[in-house]
C-alpha cells in the first residue's frame, strides 16, 4: 500500500515553555534533537504535539505552557505542514488570562472553531518516558492510551468521550442529590447509552484491526508482539448491533440508579474498561515482564499502531519519540530506525548523545538544543 508523507517544513515558537522565540527550518527527513537533560528537547516535541487536538503529550494545563516571565499572557506555535489536504499553515496558542484560558487555532490565517479540524491535515503520535509504566500503572492511564490510539483513526472519538463524561457527571449529580426524576434521568441515560456504546465499539474495532496487523507481523519483527484484549464493559458482546447494545446499556443504567447513588459514581460503562497486554512470544502478562521487555513491547505496539494509521488513512503519522534510544542496544536501535523510516513519515526524536542516532545517517536532520537555543 502506498503511504503518502506528511511533514513539517517550518516550526516557530513564541513564549512556549523555555523558548522566548525559536524557529526550525526542516526538510522531509526525520529530525533528531540532542542536548543535555533539561535543555528543552521535549518542549519542542510538545510543541509539535499541539498540532493535534488535546493538551499535548504532557497533558498540560494550558496556562502552564506559557514561558515564565513572558510579557504576553499566552504562547503561540506556527507550523508549515505538507499535510493530508495539501500545504497548510497552522497557528495555535492560547488566549485569555487567569481562570478563562482557551486554545485558538488558525488554518492558513483563518480562525476555525474546533481544534478537531487539525486531524484533516495530520495525525501526530508519540511515545515518551512517562509512558514506560503503562502496563504497571493505573487503568485510567491505559484507557487514555487506548483512546489516543482510537483518535488517530476516528477523530470524532475524543468529542464523544468528553460528551459522555459530561453526561455522566450530570447523572451522578442528580443521583447524589436524590433527584430520581425519570424524565431527566431517562434523557441523560439515553445520551450516555448512545455515546458510551459508540466509544466502546470504536475501541473494539480499532483493537481488532491492530491485533490483525500485529499477528500478520509476528515472528519477523525486531520488537516483541503484543496480544491485546479489553475487559470491564460489554465484554464479548461488542460485535452485536449497536442499537441492541444501547438498549442493554440504557437498561443497565436505569436498573443501577440506586446502586450508583449509594456508590457515589456510575459503576457500569466504557469508563471502567481496561486494556490488557501480553507478551505474545512468552505468553506472559506485560506487567510481569522485565522493564526492558516492557519498553520493547510498548515500542512495538506504538510502531504497529503508526503503521495501522498509515494503512487506514493513506498518510503516515508524524511520530514524536522522546529519549527513544536511551535503553536500546545498538542492534535494536538500528532496527528501530529502519522501522521508523519504513513507515514513510517524518519523526522527531530526542536524546542526549547524537552518536546514538548515527545509524540514521543522512536520513535525518540533526539539531543541538541548549537552554532555549537551537543550532543545526
From Swiss-Prot:
Q: Which InterPro entries match?
A: AAA+_ATPase, DNA-binding_RecF, DNA-binding_RecF_CS, P-loop_NTPase, RecF/RecN/SMC_N, RecF_2
Q: Is Mitochondrion given among the entry's keywords?
A: no
Indicate which residues the UniProt annotation says bind ATP: 35-42
Q: Which GO terms describe its molecular function?
A: ATP binding; ATP hydrolysis activity; single-stranded DNA binding
What are the annotated GO cellular component locations? cytoplasm
SMART domains per record: AAA
Q: Please classify the protein's predominant subcellular localization into one broad category.
A: cytoplasm
State the superkingdom.
Bacteria
Query: What GO biological process terms are annotated to this protein in UniProt?
Result: DNA replication; DNA synthesis involved in DNA repair; double-strand break repair; SOS response
Keywords (A to Z) from UniProt: ATP-binding, Cytoplasm, DNA damage, DNA repair, DNA replication, DNA-binding, Nucleotide-binding, SOS response
Record-linked Gene3D superfamilies: P-loop containing nucleotide triphosphate hydrolases, RecF/RecN/SMC, N-terminal domain
Q: Where in the cell is it found?
A: Cytoplasm
CDD domains in the record:
ABC_RecF
What is any Pfam family matched here?
Answer: SMC_N
Q: What does this protein do?
A: The RecF protein is involved in DNA metabolism; it is required for DNA replication and normal SOS inducibility. RecF binds preferentially to single-stranded, linear DNA. It also seems to bind ATP.
The record, for PANTHER family, names: DNA REPLICATION AND REPAIR PROTEIN RECF
By sequence similarity, the record places it as follows: Belongs to the RecF family.
Name of this chain's protein: DNA replication and repair protein RecF
Q: What is the originating organism of this protein?
A: Agrobacterium fabrum (strain C58 / ATCC 33970) (Agrobacterium tumefaciens (strain C58))
